[in-house]
From Swiss-Prot:
Binding residue positions for S-adenosyl-L-methionine: 73, 94, 122-123, 139
Pathway per the UniProt entry: Quinol/quinone metabolism; menaquinone biosynthesis; menaquinol from 1,4-dihydroxy-2-naphthoate: step 2/2; Cofactor biosynthesis; ubiquinone biosynthesis
Organism: Francisella philomiragia subsp. philomiragia (strain ATCC 25017 / CCUG 19701 / FSC 153 / O#319-036)
The name this protein goes by in its record: Ubiquinone/menaquinone biosynthesis C-methyltransferase UbiE
Catalyzed reactions: a 2-demethylmenaquinol + S-adenosyl-L-methionine = a menaquinol + S-adenosyl-L-homocysteine + H(+); a 2-methoxy-6-(all-trans-polyprenyl)benzene-1,4-diol + S-adenosyl-L-methionine = a 5-methoxy-2-methyl-3-(all-trans-polyprenyl)benzene-1,4-diol + S-adenosyl-L-homocysteine + H(+)
Keyword Ligase: no
Enzyme Commission code: 2.1.1.163, 2.1.1.201
One GO BP annotation of this record: aerobic respiration
Amino acid sequence: MSKENKTTDFGFTEVPWEEKQKKVAGVFHSVAAKYDLMNDLMSFGIHRIWKKQTIAKTGVRKGDKVLDLAGGTGDLAYKFCQMVGSQGKVVLSDINSSMLEVGKEKLTNKGCVGNIEYVQANAECLPFPDNYFDCITISFGLRNVTDKAKALASMCRVLKPGGRLLVLEFSKPIVPMLSKVYDEYSFKALPFLGKIITQDAESYKYLAESIRKHPDQETLKQMMYDAGFDNVEYQNMTGGIVALHIGYKY
């Protein structure tokens, strides 16, 4: 089937392959200004713990080059700037210009200058040299990518041998009772919060649906192996609501 005839998921809706990127862009242009506030409200602040645990697993050191992909408003990039020091470099990359602008303003106001670059880029075709980064992170962004396999292969290409990729993403709860509560919260509370805070219930309806369409823990693990990563492992967080996958390039 040619790409012109292919379809893919946008939440629970099937859309033409080339249309998903535009629709996802619309979501994040809409929510960028209130993105951080909504993250705190939706997760009761727990997203900060998930990200802190992710950063602790990166192994980032002084002088490293780090790519924070789909980095949005820069929660991880800010910490990486401190970790790599003046001799290192952090690239905060996002496909969405609104998110990137919010991230740049936020990090500049926090004094993160000199060792950070901002690059608008598509994860499926990263504009960086082969074997360039010591570490790549993508936090709550992979599920929005149209061609996830292509994006993972692109990440593998730009990662140095010996480097690691960390994928922090919503996943499949492993506790049945938690799964039921989570479904109720996702499909009812999230759109309601979105309507009250951002005047955009539909974007948060998409959020809940996109989580359900994202590959589960074992499927994503295999996708990372298929993309060229080795020693792939994952850690469930908060009962599997979120999972952190780590893969290495040798």
